[in-house]
Regions:
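Short, non-transmembrane alpha-helical segments in secretory-pathway proteins
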Residues: 27-51
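C-terminal motif of bacterial Sec signal peptides marking the signal peptidase cleavage site
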Residues: 14-17
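Sec-dependent signal peptide recognition
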Residues: 2-8
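Bacterial signal peptide processing site
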Residues: 19-22
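Residue-level signal for glycine
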Residues: 86-87
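Exposed beta-strand-loop-beta-strand "reactive/processing" segments of non-cytosolic proteins
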Residues: 55-74, 78
Length: 124
């Protein structure tokens, strides 16, 4: 019986220490080197009611630079891609046609290293 309790306690300790932040707490997905202006945009979104669908931010490498894609706050809006200085590069998707603003038609094919930076996990 002591061995069973010891194994159980060890298993609980292992599971507790292996908790995954990306599953349990999406807020912790942000890397430490996120640009201040991108963080400010995320903080701004957090200060208003939850979007429908909830906001998300992904980083990509596009044309040899790290860029950030912000989801739109509602239907038929552009999904905006910005650089590390928060300069708008383009909107590769969204809008009435779903094809974006046409300024980066190669984004879907050439952007690499998609990484979820933040997803709004608040409930409506």
């Amino acid at each position: 019986m002591k061995k069973v309790m010891l194994v159980f306690a060890f298993g609980v300790a292992v599971l507790w220490s292996c908790k995954s932040n990306s599953i349990d707490n999406p807020e912790n997905l942000q890397p430490l080197n996120i640009p201040a202006c991108v963080q400010a945009k995320i903080d701004s979104i957090k200060s208003i009611p939850v979007w429908n669908p909830p906001a998300s931010v992904y980083s990509y490498v596009y044309k040899n630079q790290t860029v950030y894609s912000f989801s739109a706050d509602c239907c038929d809006q552009f999904n905006v891609v910005i650089d590390a200085n928060c300069k708008v590069i383009c909107s590769p998707s969204g809008g009435i046609t779903g094809n974006g603003d046409g300024r980066c038609p190669d984004f879907q094919k050439t952007a690499t290293n998609e990484t979820l930076i933040w997803k709004d996990s608040r409930k409506k």
